[in-house]
Amino acid sequence: MPAPIEVGRICVKTAGREAGKYCVVVDIVDENFVIITGPKDVTGVKRRRCNIKHLEPTPEKVDIDRGASDEEVKEALEEAGLLDLMKEGIVSGS
C-alpha cells in the first residue's frame, strides 16, 4: 500500500516539466489537489498547486506545519538529513 499524501510527505512528480523531481507537500487544498514545494533553490520545484494524480509518495516524511514557508521546509529537510536526497534531483525511471 502506498504512503498517504499528507503534509510533510516527500513525493516525486510524475507529470509535467518537473517530472522525476522530489517535492514536499505543504498543504492540502481538497481531495484532488495539494500545494507542493521543492523548495525551488533545492530541487528546482517551485511552490504550486498540483494534482495528486501527478505525485508518487515516498516513505519519507518531514515534520512541518501546514502552510510552512520554503525556509521552514528546507530547515526540516536539513534536520531529517534528507537535503542530499532532495538535491539529487531527477529520479531515474525504469
From Swiss-Prot:
Transmembrane segments: none annotated. Pfam families: KOW. Keywords: Ribonucleoprotein, Ribosomal protein. GO terms for cellular component: cytosolic large ribosomal subunit. Signal peptide: none annotated. GO terms for biological process: ribosomal large subunit biogenesis; translation. One of its GO terms (molecular function) is RNA binding. This is Large ribosomal subunit protein eL14. The lineage of its organism: Archaea, Methanobacteriati, Methanobacteriota, Methanomada group, Methanopyri.
